[in-house]
């Protein structure tokens, strides 16, 4: 039975993979480590690595794996001539792997003459086509090669897909677009990259690698096949480029998405040679396919991952390293296990009490991707809070109408505030941040110098005594609650600086609208942490979200079920511009921020409960 082929590739949302025979993006350190480990690691070696899953991947470029020598099993990497020649001479051949170059012009003796063959390294082979390379592997390396990885270029990728031999795709999703002149071919399932793939198809290279079908392998193009993700990592970033890693598995379009239970897949990780058939191929199981990646990434809580639920977010993704899965799994948990109750709005909720999420800020920014988050609204509202502004009309005039329904004449009257003008939220949020305890008159009054400026005090403590355990800011003022249009939902935050001068923020939220509000709140306090870190000369580290009454409105359930079917994409990066000008928290403007690499799924309509 023919060995399957796995494709390893890094690409932009529009499937760009190269330009001028090189990479379009700057050096991505973790991607290089990922490529090395995936293509070097055999199933046996992965199973021996610290009982499968080390807590941290190695800090150096060394894989820590034994070099395959003659008599030991190893993996093969197959590449086109241009890919081979694009690698610096000192890095070729790729060590600890059998290298096969597909070319009609190169000769094995020419490659061998480049430099002496290292001890234990297999000699580089040259074949005229991908089918010829696969035949060579089957005939001469049947008992020594474990897995076959095609690593470029575009023509070989297209040949593997057309031949129907590609069982798994190892994709690095580069979230930013770069100018490209070479593109990965379109494939069923490429919406994992973006909402609509629009890249023009690059012509296949002149080398004879593209074959629409291959009678000698008995394989024809399978129009009923698609690729779906079984692994999504957390987001990494290097040189201002956010990216993550996904593994896609070949499936028939008619297959039930929940056929492969996560518990079965994870239990098979302890098997060293387990394989399952994929369309007539001897393909690795889902677990075996992701084993090389699992071998260097942090382990998620296995019991949580294996738990069977009535509703589950993208259940075919077995390894859920992307931090957005916290949010998606929270939605599913509430719908499955929450209590249905009445609420103030009259809509009704399904709720749980006491939930937590953690989001890293040192690599990327947690702007959720399974639906588009209103970034302008997040930014403008936070700046509004920081100014201590209580006039919601100022937001509405900028197109941010998130407060409009809570400051109408009817709503203010229902709060026993008939004396308030439309748009006046009262002494809430930003007023308490900057003027805690001051007597509130109306949204037009200048409160400079009145009350306690909590935000200023926190920043001063971070600058002068960063180990202080009293760096808190609260919007909850019991004496003023009846004067507010809405009592604050997110009401307390605390800051912490570690010994590496990294800043983290904890926020406690008493009332959490998971469908509409929580994605906004995650982004808002993450952004606040970035801003405070900048003016205090610290590095952002983590945002921790503590949630009290955590609920899904009953009229959001169907929309959220749609969201649970969407795979997360890489988180973006948020850059602060004009850094030299910004010395104090009040110096920030909306023009000082740049979001890089945000490629979310489309919007999902949900009505706000008032």
Swiss-Prot record:
Its EC number(s): 1.5.1.3, 2.1.1.45
GO biological process: dTMP biosynthetic process; methylation; one-carbon metabolic process; tetrahydrofolate biosynthetic process
Residues of the active site: 489
Domain named DHFR: residues: 4-250
Residues engaged in binding NADP(+): 10, 16-22, 81-83, 102-105, 152-159
Keyword Kinase in record: no
Pathway annotation from the record: Cofactor biosynthesis; tetrahydrofolate biosynthesis; 5,6,7,8-tetrahydrofolate from 7,8-dihydrofolate: step 1/1
Chain segments annotated as transmembrane: none
Binding site for dUMP: 344, 490, 509-513, 521, 551-553
Pfam families reported in the protein's UniProt record: DHFR_1, Thymidylat_synt
Compositionally skewed regions (Polar residues) per UniProt: 261-275
Catalytic activity: (6S)-5,6,7,8-tetrahydrofolate + NADP(+) = 7,8-dihydrofolate + NADPH + H(+); dUMP + (6R)-5,10-methylene-5,6,7,8-tetrahydrofolate = 7,8-dihydrofolate + dTMP
Gene Ontology MF term list: dihydrofolate reductase activity; thymidylate synthase activity
Entry keyword set: Methyltransferase, Multifunctional enzyme, NADP, Nucleotide biosynthesis, One-carbon metabolism, Oxidoreductase, Transferase
Residues annotated as binding substrate: 8, 31, 157, 172
SUPFAM superfamilies, per the entry: Dihydrofolate reductase-like (SSF53597), Thymidylate synthase/dCMP hydroxymethylase (SSF55831)
Region spans: Thymidylate synthase: 322-610
GO cellular component: cytosol; mitochondrion
Region named Disordered: 256-282
InterPro entries documented for this protein: DHFR-like_dom_sf, DHFR-TS, DHFR_CS, DHFR_dom, Thymidate_synth/dCMP_Mease, Thymidate_synth/dCMP_Mease_dom, Thymidate_synth/dCMP_Mease_sf, Thymidylate_synthase
UniProt record similarity statement: In the N-terminal section; belongs to the dihydrofolate reductase family.
Function per UniProt: Bifunctional enzyme. Involved in de novo dTMP biosynthesis. Key enzyme in folate metabolism. Catalyzes an essential reaction for de novo glycine and purine synthesis, DNA precursor synthesis, and for the conversion of dUMP to dTMP.
UniProt protein name: Bifunctional dihydrofolate reductase-thymidylate synthase
Organism: Toxoplasma gondii
